[in-house]
Structure formats: structure tokens, C-alpha cells
A protein has these predicted regions:
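Short beta-strand segments
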Residues: 2, 28-30, 88-91, 121-123, ...
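Alpha-helix C-terminal capping segments
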Residues: 74-80, 107-118
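Short, Asp-centered acidic motifs that coordinate Mg2+ and/or phosphate
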Residues: 85
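Short glycine-rich anion-binding loops that position phosphate/pyrophosphate groups of nucleotides
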Residues: 5, 33, 66-67, 91-94, ...
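Glycine/threonine-rich flexible loop motifs
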Residues: 94-103
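A cross-family phosphate/adenosyl-ligand binding-site feature
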Residues: 10-77, 81-82
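Electrostatically charged, flexible surface regions
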Residues: 137-264
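Glycine-rich phosphate/pyrophosphate-binding loops
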Residues: 113-138
């Protein structure tokens, strides 16, 4: 079990407790919040590993690196044999549409499948909507649902290059309308650049934006959340655009290369 909010975040404890009955559970998570770090890894500095106590008294590995570092450490021997499954979350806030390319939660799961380990990413909206610390969350439904998905993710018949991206709406479990298998929608942010401090030639900026538009078309993850449904989206790490390849097949790339060589 890992996350990007940090080893002491409430969501990872809830997820760990939900999957505890399934077998031996190891928690390997960042020491501090590493949200929106995507697939960043540590390559120049040593990774510091410390054992810390979680809220239920069990021990976890706290890592100085990123969520992807956590998965790599687990797969490469920190816990002995590689894990049978990686479950990442439960994130404080949704990871829908465009968010998945930024998300450390989703990246950790993708790293799992890239290493041949089935994986699930889990995210939860705050009650009433919103994300981040200081808000109220109910992780019970989304984490129990993720635990039920673990045997399916591990099934030999399921493609090993695919993760389940699970998102829970910001409602109490009794208000859930069900669950839906979805595709990614679009969540475009209206970003602004704010100058917060200026001292001589040094300036401090903050980039921030609220979602400007949502793709609420039927079948999208955003539409499911809007309908108070749990959303489950299969994702994979192959970013190839097959339609683009078909279009580019008409390009004479050899001719382009020849012209480049002749120009030199």
C-alpha cells in the first residue's frame, strides 16, 4: 500500500485497514506530501527509509522519495519478495480526466504494472466536494470497494498492463447511487500566475487554477462522480495514439530524413 499524500495521511490508513483481511500488508509511503509529482523518481540522492507507527499502531516504511520510488523499493527487495498487488491511495481528492497525468497516486499504480505487478489507484472526494487536508472525508466505501477489486486485478485473465483507477464521490456511503466502469473525461483548469513576493531579481510565483470545464459526456469518470457513482477506469501506460500512427503512415518519413541528411 502506498500513496502520495504521505505516510500519516488518513486515506492510506483507511485503505490499509480495508485490505488487511486479504493477506500480509506492507505500507511503503513518502515521509511527506508528494502530491502531483506524477512519475518522478529519485536518481541522484540516496533514499532514506524509516519505520514509523501508523494511527492503528502498526508499522510502515516512510520513504524520503516519491510514490514511484516507494513501489520500486517494494518490488526490488525492501519487503523481501515483490508484492502480489500494489494499491495506491486513498488520495485526498479526486483523480479524474486530465488529473491522472499529474497524480502521484495514479503514477504509483502505473509503476506497479510496469514492473509486472497488478495495481489499483484509489481517490476520494471530500464530503460536499473538494480536496486536500482539513476537509472531511469518508473513505469507507471507496476503500472497501478497492479491496473487493484486488482479486479481480490479480486474476490471470485480466491484462497485466492495466490498472483500475477508482474514484469516490463526496457523499456518505448511504447516498451512493452505485458504481460504473468509465473512460477518462476532460478536466481543464483555468490557471493563473500570481506574483507573491519580489526581492531584487528574485520573484516568487504561484500557479493555481480551478477546473474551468468538465467533460460530462455519458460514460466519463466525471459524469459518474456527478451522478454520485463510484467510478472505475481502466488505464494503461502505453500512450501510443494508434489513430495518429495510421495517419502518419501516409507521411514519407524516409524522404524527410533524406532531406535532413542532405541539408547537413
Amino acid at each position: 500500500v502506498t500513496n502520495d499524500d504521505g505516510v500519516h495521511a488518513p486515506g492510506i490508513l483507511a485503505l490499509k485497514q480495508a485490505v488487511d483481511p486479504l493477506g500480509e500488508v506492507f505500507v511503503i509511503a513518502p515521509m511527506v506530501n508528494r502530491s502531483a509529482i506524477a512519475r518522478g523518481i529519485t536518481i541522484r540522492d540516496p533514499l532514506v527509509v524509516d519505520e514509523v507507527e501508523m494511527g492503528d499502531g502498526t508499522l510502515a516504511f516512510a520513504i524520503s522519495g516519491t510514490p514511484v520510488d516507494c513501489v520500486r523499493l517494494g518490488a526490488l527487495g525492501l519487503i523481501g519478495a515483490p508484492p502480489d498487488v500494489v494499491v495506491s491511495g486513498a488520495n485526498l481528492g479526486l483523480n479524474l480526466g486530465d488529473d491522472v497525468t499529474y497524480s502521484g497516486t495514479v503514477a504509483a499504480a502505473l509503476e506497479g504494472v510496469m514492473l509486472g505487478i497488478p495495481a489499483i489507484a484509489v481517490s476520494q472526494d471530500a464530503l460536499g466536494g473538494g480536496s486536500g487536508p482539513g476537509l472531511d472525508y469518508d473513505f469507507s466505501a471507496v476503500t472497501r470497494f478497492a479491496a473487493r477489486l484486488v482479486p479481480l486485478a490479480c486474476a490471470a485473465r485480466f491484462p497485466r498492463h492495466v490498472i483500475f483507477n477508482v474514484n469516490g464521490p463526496g457523499v456518505a456511503p448511504g447516498a451512493l447511487a452505485g458504481a460504473r466502469v468509465t473512460r477518462l473525461g476532460r478536466r481543464v483548469y483555468d490557471d493563473t500566475l500570481s506574483l507573491e513576493l519580489e526581492s531584487g531579481s528574485t520573484r516568487h510565483f504561484r500557479i493555481y487554477g480551478e477546473p474551468m470545464s468538465h467533460d460530462m459526456q455519458p460514460g466519463t469518470d466525471l459524469s459518474a462522480i456527478d451522478d454520485n457513482l463510484l467510478s472505475v477506469t481502466p488505464l494503461h501506460f502505453d500512450l501510443t495514439d494508434l489513430a495518429g500512427m495510421d495517419h502518419m503512415a501516409r507521411w514519407e518519413v524516409d524522404v524527410l530524413l533524406t532531406s535532413v541528411i542532405q541539408a547537413d
